[in-house]
């Protein structure tokens, strides 16, 4: 975070309003059948601030977290295969006591469907995290997107708007 916005705690209000990928101003290859939320971040290279996303798997066909480098307009790690820049639904490990409805043999309407995703500076201790994406030290401007594809008609954008965003000190 830049010095003027460096804080800790709940920052759920930092999420954008949900928007459709059909909007012409949406960058990063939007899909018109998806609903998006994003959080734009400007940070100093030595910053140790990370982000914790806690929510429920959406009632939708697909969901994923993608982290982009705003300067290059590419995924945060580009073509570096040793790091991940995105976390898809099927690869997201559910919180203890919960189930991932995107995995085989799990009912889509499972009630316990919570997960936690961390986005933290590269070099942070991630040994206690099941789901994480690291931020390269040299990336100062990034956007974290949550994409929900084809939410069910009975759910409001897949019910992921309640995903809580927290600043953490990695």
Feature annotation, model-predicted:
Residues 1-170:
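A compositional/structural signature for long, glycine/proline-rich flexible linkers
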